[in-house]
Structures are given as structure tokens and as C-alpha cells.
Amino acid sequence: MATFNVLCSNRFRFNGGYSPEKFNRKVSSRSSELNVCVSRIRTQSFSCRRLGGFMEIGETRLGVIRVHGDSRNRFSCNSEIKRLVTGDYGDKETRIGENGRNKGKRRRFSLRLRPRLRLVRMRLGRFDFRASMEDFRYFLKKNLKRVILSTGVALIFGLCYLFLRLTAVPSPSIVPYSDFVTNLRGGSVSKVLLEEGSRRIYYNTDENVEVVDDVHKSETLEDPAIQIDGGTVTEAVTKDDTPRKVRALPPVWKYVTRKVDHDEKFLLSLMREKGITYSSAPQSALMSMRTTLITIISLWIPLTPLMWLLYRQLSASNSPAKKRRSKNPTVGFDDVEGVDSAKDELVEIVSCLQGSINYKKLGARLPRGVLLVGPPGTGKTLLARAVAGEAGVPFFSVSASEFVELFVGRGAARIRDLFNAARKNSPSIIFIDELDAVGGKRGRSFNDERDQTLNQLLTEMDGFESDTKVIVIAATNRPEALDSALCRPGRFSRKVLVAEPDQEGRRKILAIHLRDVPLEEDAFLICDLVASLTPGFVGADLANIVNEAALLAARRGGEAVAREDIMEAIERAKFGINDKEARPRTLGNELSKMFPWMPSLARRNGPDQDGLQGPLGYQTLS
């Protein structure tokens, strides 16, 4: 027994437990058209009648929307969606399962789409057109050059691409020269063109002419008198009397070859013998432009980044002649201690530049150069930084190694750029650090670049324009390696020795470095103690001791730096880290000489003295 449900387009529903026979009899009385749907399941066939339409009041024929049959053998027959009869309610097509699967899909789609639509609506609500235009205007104003350059490059590439597309012609097949001679002897060559200025030979054969004729015949022009001239646009009429525009193409050559040198006489005699039409013509201007453009695109565009990098290396934009603009607080002469004699010399020069000392009424001239000489770490660069902070004039700071380049002549060019920039901002100061890198004695090496750079420096310091207010301050720790012409009066008129500080100088230097360091004891006592324990130390060594002491205090978790941290830092600076064999003897002897009233420290390394405290209240130094 099977159950059938019938749904018609006028919303009339047939349902109930009808057998196929009853259903067919029920429907056949009111049906105008019957179709049969046959389905197979498990080698069994089952037939069911499908209703084509109903008659209602004898006026309208209605189409069936759906017929569904279900049997006990799990057989189901769904009629296909089809408009059977045209009527008032049967004109629209309906899909099977529209109330089932499509409804679930539509619901899932709406659940996914709703939050996205809500998010888009919120963003559109917050969108401010005026603010967007202001941002766009600011972007254009800030990046106007880049936008113009990018637009121009894109436009040029677009025009080049359009030109290449419009001027594209079919390329002929390349054949050997021997094949060309063979075709000439065989008489199959119809026309030959010798291109002037090159070795290319274009030719067509008789087979090519026939193919071309067939192509023209297929077009079947009504008026044979209408010809297509080369490079002009004419009007043609086809069989259907429809006028159309035809643009003439250049002559298409099927084959091309390259002629052999000193074979022109043989080739011309052979063509004359065979009666072949030949001619010569220069390459057209359009093709020349196309060839040039292709060469530029394929050769120069890949080289453009390399040329740009090379230009940046050779240009003055990478020059060290840049005015020093430091965002950090500048260093003054109050921050320089321990080198009083050198500081006095530089203070005098700064005063002359600022106009505090009237040196002109006495007939004096500013020294052209000041050479700071001294061991490493004595504060030569710090003095130059103090000059930059106190002078109030343009200050140019460079390193001598920046003038030595791979390319010959670039060092001299950078020297010229540096002094030109200094002259434009005169009075000004130029500081050259580590002068021995470029100012070494000439003739000791084969480096011509270094010699040319030194020659340019000598010329700039004492050349024809010697009355300009440009002072050169240089620092070196190898004065014996400098060239004698560079150290003569008139170039470096003053040679200032920046020596190692004495005990009082070390105390002043320590006082400067300990200004921002919290101490457990009095800073004056610590400064005296460290200055007395560090003979021969320079400013860089003392700054390192203070920094090491602060690091040791941070390691042990202290809130301030103690004497033990400072003494440990002194031991690290003198003897290195973990060098316990050299520490006790040397430092103990020094402390015994300093404090003779204290007990002898010779026994402090004994096994019974490990827990005792050393002098000044700190633990033993081992």
C-alpha cells in the first residue's frame, strides 16, 4: 500500500491512503493529461500516475506543482518541477523541496549575514566624508612628489604597452640562408625585400601568395574595384550589403633570413636570372621606434635600481657635511673636568667666535686648526662636544674614516662638500675625530685615494680662501703618524695635549659622574678614596668604575651604591674579572702604604682570617 500526496497550483491538496489504482481512478476522472514516472529500486519497478492538471468550474486548467508517492518498500517518487499547463495559477515554476532544504539554507545564510550587515551599517554610520577628504588631502600634500612620480611612471608604462600592442605585426619565420637560396633556384620565391641598414632579407613564396588570395576571396567583396591601400582606411561592402571599415595592414612577410657577407653579387644575379621581383627599403620609423622602446624596456629598466644606488653612493646626499642637530641635552664646559689646560684653550677660541674677546684690534687672527693630542679616553671627543654646546655657532662633526671610500676621488669630494657647507654657515667649527685615519704620512702606502683626500684637506685648511672664519678641531692619539704638512703652523696652529688627570682631576671627574648615583656614604669621601686608589686612570676608566659599581649594587638588590661595590669595581678595572691571584698582593700593598696605622694585611688570606673584615669596614677583597 502506498500513500500519495498531490499538491496543485490552486492550493488544492489530495492526500490519504490511496492505492495507485484508486489514485489513478480518482484523478483520471478530472485529469486532462496523464504522465507516467517510472523509478527503479533494487531491480523492482513501480509506476505511478502524475496528474497533469485539474478542471475547476470548467474555466481554468491548473498545473500540478508536486506529486509525491511513498510506499512500504521505502520507495519515493517525486515528480519533476515542470509547468504542464498554462493557466491563471500555473505560469510560475516551482522547485522541489522549496519548503524544505531551501528554507534551512536561507535561514543559515541570514544568520551569517545579519552580523556582517550590522557591522557594515555601523561603519557606514561612523564614516565621515569630510574627515576622509581631509586625510586624503594631507596625504597628497605630504607625499606629492611620490604620487606624481608614481603616476608618471605608471602612465609612461601604460603608453608604452599601448604603443607596443597597436604596432604589433606578425613575425616572420626565421629560415637559414641556404633554404632561401634553394627556394630561389627552385623558382618558388615570389617577392624579396632587402632591408637597408641591416642584414635581414624578407621573402614570400608562391604558396604564401595562394594562401593570401584564398583569404581575400573568402571575404567576397561585392565591388572588386574598391582596393585597400597601404596605411589607409577604406569602405568595403560584403554580401549582406553591410558597409564596414577595414584598416590596411603592412605587407606580411612569411620568411626572413640573414644574408652572408660578400654574397650580394651572386644573390642579385640569381634573382635576375629567375625573374623574381626584389626591392630594398629602409626600416620604417614605426618599427624603429618599436625596436628602440623594446630595447629600453628590456635593458635599461632592470638597470635603473642599480643606477639609482650608484647615484646615491656618488652623490653629495650621503656626504658627512651635515649640520649636527642633537636632540639630547648638549654638553658644556661645566661637564668637563680634569683637563683644565686643554679646556682653557678651547674656551678662548669659543670666546673669540662669540665676540667676547676683541682680538682684531691687536692684529690677531683666529687659529685655523686646533689639534687635540692625548691617550685614549682622556676626553678629547668630550671637549669637542663641549665646544659644540658652548660655541653657539654651526658645528659639523665627522669621522676621518668617512672620507675614505672605495671609489677614487670620493674622499676629496666629501672634503670639499664639508668645507663648502662650513663656509656658507661661517663662523663655524669642524670637528674631525681620529684624524690619523686620513692624515697619515704620504708615501708609505699605495692608497692613492687616501693621498688625494689628504691633499684636498691641506688645500682647504690653508688655501686661497684663508680668511674665512672656519675653525678645524681634530683629535688623535697617534700624533707621530700624521703628515708633517698637516701639522705645520697655519693649518693646525695649536697642538693641545690632553694628558692623564692627576689626583685632583680624578676627584673632580668622579664628582661629575657620581652626581646622579645614590650613595650610602658621603660622595666627597668616596671621591677622595677612589681618586687615591686609581693613579694613571683617565676619564673613561673612572666613568666605567662608577657604572660597574652601580651594576654590582643592582645585582645584590641594594637601594644605593656602597663602598664594597666601588672597591669591587676598582678591582675589576685594575685586574679584570676573576683574577684573584693578582688582586690581594697588589691592592693590599697599596692600602698598606695609604693607611700605615692599620694592621698589616699580609695575614688576611689565612684560613683563620676568612671571616674578618678588612680595612675601612668592608669585607676582604679576595
Curated annotation (Swiss-Prot):
PROSITE patterns, A to Z: AAA
Topology class, membrane: Multi-pass membrane protein
Transit peptide: 1-42
GO terms under cellular component: chloroplast envelope; chloroplast membrane; cytosol
Chain ranges passing through the membrane: 147-167, 291-311
Main subcellular localisation: plastid
InterPro entries recorded: AAA+_ATPase, AAA_lid_3, ATPase_AAA_core, ATPase_AAA_CS, P-loop_NTPase, Pept_M41_FtsH_extracell
Entry-annotated residues carrying Phosphothreonine: 86
Location of region: Disordered: 600-622
Entry's localization field: Plastid, Chloroplast membrane
Pfam families reported for this sequence: AAA (PF00004), AAA_lid_3 (PF17862), FtsH_ext (PF06480)
Binding-site positions, ATP: 374-381
GO MF annotations in UniProt: ATP binding; ATP hydrolysis activity; ATP-dependent peptidase activity; metalloendopeptidase activity; zinc ion binding
Loss of function: phenotype: Embryo defective.
Highest taxon of source: Eukaryota
Keyword Signal appears in the UniProt entry: no
Keyword terms: ATP-binding, Chloroplast, Hydrolase, Membrane, Nucleotide-binding, Phosphoprotein, Plastid, Protease, Transit peptide, Transmembrane, Transmembrane helix
Coiled coil (residue ranges): none
One biological process term in Gene Ontology: proteolysis
Oligomer status and interactors: Oligomer.
Family: Belongs to the AAA ATPase family.
Role description: Might be involved in chaperone functions or play a structural role in the thylakoid FtsH complex.
Name of protein: Probable inactive ATP-dependent zinc metalloprotease FTSHI 3, chloroplastic
Lineage of producing organism: Eukaryota, Viridiplantae, Streptophyta, Embryophyta, Tracheophyta
